[in-house]
Structure formats: C-alpha cells, structure tokens
Amino acid sequence: MKTFVAKPETVKRDWYVVDATGKTLGRLATELARRLRGKHKAEYTPHVDTGDYIIVINADKVAVTGRKETDKLYYWHTGYVGGIKQATFKEMIARRPEAVIEIAVKGMLPKGPLGRAMFRKLKVYAGGEHQHAAQQPQVLDI
C-alpha cells in the first residue's frame, strides 16, 4: 500500500464561521491554526495546503485569563529611528481587535510561503457581521 499524498488541485476546502465571544485567545488560536493547516483531515500532507477557510466574528469580545489584559504587550516598529511602539492587550482590542487574533494565529503557522498561503485563508472581523455569506459557511463550535 502506498502512502497517500494530497495534490493541491484535488484538496476540498470548506468554509467555517467561528464566534470568538468569550473564547480564550490562545485556545481559540491553536484550534484555528490546526484547521488552517488541515491537520484535522485524514488526507493531511505537510507540504500541501490542505486547510479550510475560517471566518472569525466578534474578535473584539475575545477573552484572556489572569492579568494579561493589562500585562500582555504587543510591539511593532514604525520604520523610523527610535520608532519602537507598544500597546497592551486592552489597547489593541480598542484600536484593532482583528490584529490580536491574527497575530496569535500567525505565530502558530509555518514560516514561509506555505504558511503565508494558509494565513490568507483566515478572515477576522471585529463585529458580528461578515461579507462571506455567498460561501455558505458552516458554524464551527470551538
């Protein structure tokens, strides 16, 4: 018996919608990364993008445990000399709630072209509305 190897043109991708309300950030991000990679499928192949499309709604209502709301810091650089910036989790949720989930999931995906292709299948929205109704996403309870 030969080992099955998925081909990019034969992979079937589904669309799922996940409500992040009250979900713990890390636990949500690990499951999203797993499904974006396709590891939940029997035909998973490490060098082929076999994952599904994931839509996350209510990203502004994601939760963290302990004192991470005030202690967890996000850093970025503006590109100018001395341009290092930082914001707490609470400030990031107020400024750009989508970025919190995107950063958490991106760190759990492979680095390189395949990981970037997987990350493009993640769609995150701060509110309860999304623009992917035509894809008929199934509700995924995590």
UniProtKB/Swiss-Prot annotation:
One GO molecular-function entry: structural constituent of ribosome
One Gene Ontology term from the biological process aspect of the record: negative regulation of translation
Keyword Protease (UniProt): no
Cellular compartments per GO CC: cytosolic large ribosomal subunit; ribosome
Superkingdom of the organism of origin: Bacteria
Keywords recorded for this protein, A-Z: Ribonucleoprotein, Ribosomal protein
Pfam families, A to Z: Ribosomal_L13 (PF00572)
Described function: This protein is one of the early assembly proteins of the 50S ribosomal subunit, although it is not seen to bind rRNA by itself. It is important during the early stages of 50S assembly.
Similarity annotation: Belongs to the universal ribosomal protein uL13 family.
Subunit structure: Part of the 50S ribosomal subunit.
Protein name (record): Large ribosomal subunit protein uL13
